[in-house]
Amino acid sequence: MASEIKVQSSNYENLRILAEYCNVNEILKRIGLRWKMQILYCISEDVYQFTKIKKVFPTLSDQVLAKRISELSEEALIYKSEIPNTTPQQLKYSVTEKGMDLIRIILDLNSWGDKWENQ
């Protein structure tokens, strides 16, 4: 578990100053959580149910998957809906427009990394 940064520390002050000039570090911290972008991408590729995502990533714990889905939903990157005519009622996840914008950026970053990783 990550520890909280003490308010009196120089690290805290540096992060505060950086945040005043640019929020990229905070964005990268939020989207860089383990499994988060992989889950978002899976949902965008029609792997849209909890159990199906688990099959793609069998080592991903139920607890972490539920937490990441909750975070993606709270950040309006995905939304949850019911699959009609299913008993018991089943849920599916879909990517929002905001989420699709982020996926495009992540794919561009991936292409950039592929291009420059050996240089």
Regions picked out by a protein language model, each given a short descriptive name:
Residues 1-31:
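N-terminal leader segment of winged-helix/HTH proteins
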Residues 19-64, 85, 90-92:
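N-terminal helix-turn-helix DNA-binding core of bacterial DNA-binding proteins
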Residues 29, 41, 73, 104, ...:
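A cross-family signal for key residues in well-ordered alpha-helices
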Residues 65, 69-72:
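Basic amphipathic alpha-helical segments that dock to polyanions
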Residues 76-83:
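A short, conserved structural fragment
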Residues 85-106:
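Basic, amphipathic "hinge/linker" alpha-helix immediately C-terminal to the N-terminal HTH DNA-binding motif
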Residues 101-117:
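Short, solvent-exposed amphipathic helices
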